[in-house]
Design a protein with these regions (language model features):
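ATP-dependent carboxylate-amine ligase
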Residues: 135, 161-167, 202-206, 212-215, ...
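Beta-strand->loop->alpha-helix junctions that form or flank phosphate-binding loops
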Residues: 19-26, 64-68, 163-190, 208-214, ...
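A generic local structural motif
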Residues: 22-25, 71-75, 97-101, 132-136, ...
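Phosphate-binding loop of NTP-binding sites
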Residues: 1-149, 155-166, 221, 227-230, ...
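Short, charged/polar "capping" segments at the starts of alpha-helices
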Residues: 1-5, 72-73, 153-158, 177-179, ...
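Acidic-glycine-rich active-site phosphate/pyrophosphate-binding loop
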Residues: 187-203
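Short acidic-hydrophobic surface loop/beta-edge motif
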Residues: 77, 195, 253-257
C-alpha cells in the first residue's frame, strides 16, 4: 500500500497504530523460532522449497513462507508446530514508511545468500545499495549461526567485506575455484540432472532428479548445507531432493503436444533467462528452442538490462520479445540485432502466437518467460497447438 491509498490515509489521519507486514511477521510468527532464511537475486523460491522439502522428509514440522507455489505442498505458507521456520527473504522494501529490505526484520540463524546482482531499479539506485542492505541483514545473524554462500560472487564479497560475525560455508560446482569449497557438486550429467554432492572433499551421495541447470545444482547445495545446520545429514537431504517436484512457474511443463513441449518460467532478469535456457539446451541437445519473453518487471520495462538481453537468450534458436507496453527501446534493440532471423518483436498475444506458429517444427521446446500473466498467452498458445494437432482445446492445470 502506498500514500494516497484511502485506507493508508485513514490510518494516518486517525492516528491508528500500524506496522509493516515483515515487522508483524517478525513479532507474531518468527519470534523465538530458529529462522532459516533464503536471500539473493535469483533462486530464492526454489531454494526455499528445496530446504523445506528436506526438512519435511526428515520429520520436521517447520513453519514456512514461500513466495511461490511449491509443488510438494498444498499451500505457500503454514505456521508449523516446530521451532523452525523457513522463509523466502526478499530484498524489496518493507512498506511506504520503511524503505529497508523486508529481510532486515527476519533475524535468521541460518542464512542462505544465493547470489547478488542489480535488480529492482525502482527502489535501488545501484548494486552497491543492495550490497548495503545485505550487509544489514548479515549484521543480524548470530555468531553461533551460519551463512551459506557461493564461492564466486563479487557482489556478495563486497557485502560481506563490510563486516560479518558469523561462520561461512561456501558452495561450488565442478572445479570453478582453485581452493576447496565446503560444499561442491561434481556434474555427472551435463544438464545438471545428476551430480555427486561432496562435503569437505568427501563424496556424500549422488543426486538424480527432474530439474536441470547448474543454477539448480547450486540451489541444492545451499539447501543441503542449511539442512545440515539443523541436524539433517547430507545423505538424507540428497535422498529427499531426489524426490523433489520443483516449484510452479520454474520450467514447469504445461503441455506436450505431438512433440512440442511448452514450458512456463518466471525468469525476468538476463541472468535467469540465460541459466534457464542453458539448462534446457544441455538437456535437449540440438532440438529447436523457441523463447517467448515478456520484459515485465519494473527494472526490465525501464530497459536497465537492455545491454545484456539479446545475449541472455543466445541458447534459443528463435526469440520472440513481447512489446505489449510500447517500449521504444525494445524495438530499437531488436531492430539493431540485424537480419539474422533469430529475434522478433510481437506487439500482441495474437502476433506472438503467429510468430511461434510460423517457426514451429517437431520436436520443439517453447519456453514462455515472464514474472506475470503475459496477457494469458500460456493457455491461448497451448489451445492453438492443440487445434493444429486435431485435439480438443482444454484448460491448463491450475
Amino acid at each position: 500500500l502506498s500514500r494516497g491509498n484511502p485506507e493508508v490515509e485513514a490510518v494516518l489521519n486517525r492516528n491508528i497504530d500500524y506496522m509493516s507486514g515483515p515487522e508483524w511477521l517478525a513479532r507474531e510468527v518468527l519470534k523465538d523460532r530458529w529462522v532459516m532464511a533464503v536471500a539473493g537475486t535469483h533462486g530464492k523460491t526454489t531454494t526455499t522449497a528445496m530446504l523445506l522439502w528436506i526438512l519435511e522428509q526428515a520429520g520436521f514440522d517447520a513453519g514456512y513462507l514461500v513466495g511461490g507455489v511449491p509443488r510438494d505442498f498444498p499451500v505457500s505458507a503454514r505456521l508449523g508446530r516446530s521451532d523452525f521456520f523457513v522463509i523466502e527473504a526478499d530484498e524489496y522494501d518493507s512498506a511506504f514508511f520503511d524503505k529497508r529490505s523486508k529481510f532486515i526484520h527476519y533475524r535468521p540463524r541460518t542464512l542462505i545468500l544465493n547470489n547478488l546482482e542489480f535488480d529492482h531499479a525502482d527502489i535501488f539506485d545501484s548494486v552497491e545499495a543492495i550490497e548495503r542492505q545485505v550487509h544489514h541483514l548479515v549484521r543480524t545473524v548470530p555468531s553461533q549461526g551460519l551463512i551459506i554462500r557461493p564461492a564466486l560472487d563479487p557482489h556478495l564479497d563486497n557485502a560481506l567485506a563490510l563486516g560479518r560475525w558469523t561462520p561461512i560455508q561456501d558452495t561450488a560446482v565442478g572445479s570453478e575455484i582453485s581452493r576447496t569449497a565446503d560444499w561442491r557438486a561434481e556434474l555427472l550429467a551435463e544438464d545438471g540432472s545428476r551430480f555427486m554432492v561432496i562435503h569437505h572433499e568427501q563424496p556424500v551421495a549422488t543426486l538424480s532428479w527432474s530439474l536441470t541447470g547448474q543454477h539448480n545444482v547450486r540451489n541444492a547445495l545451499a539447501a543441503i548445507a542449511a539442512a545440515r545446520h539443523v541436524g539433517v545429514t547430507p545423505d538424507h537431504a540428497v535422498a529427499a531432493l531426489c524426490r523433489f517436484s520443483g516449484v510452479k512457474r520454474r520450467m514447469e511443463l504445461l503441455a506436450d503436444i505431438d512433440g512440442v513441449r511448452v514450458y512456463d518460467d518466471f525468469a525476468h532478469h538476463p541472468t535467469a533467462i540465460a541459466t534457464t535456457l542453458e539448462g534446457l539446451r544441455r538437456r535437449v541437445g540440438d532440438e529447436p528452442i523457441l523463447a517467448l519473453i515478456e520484459p515485465r518487471s519494473n527494472t526490465m520495462k525501464q530497459g536497465v538490462h537492455r545491454d545484456r538481453l539479446l545475449a541472455s537468450a543466445e541458447r534459443a534458436d528463435r526469440v520472440f520479445w513481447a512489446n505489449l507496453n510500447g517500449m521504444d527501446w525494445l524495438d530499437t534493440l531488436v531492430a539493431g540485432a540485424g537480419a539474422n532471423g533469430r529475434h522478433w518483436i510481437g506487439r500482441s498475444v495474437d502476433e506472438l502466437i503467429g510468430l511461434v506458429r510460423d517457426n514451429l517444427s517437431r520436436p520443439c521446446h517453447i519456453v514462455i518467460m515472464s514474472n506475470g500473466g503475459f496477457a494469458g498467452i500460456h493457455g491461448q498458445l497451448v489451445a492453438e497447438l492443440q487445434r493444429r494437432s486435431g485435439q480438443e482445446p482444454g484448460p491448463l492445470e491450475p
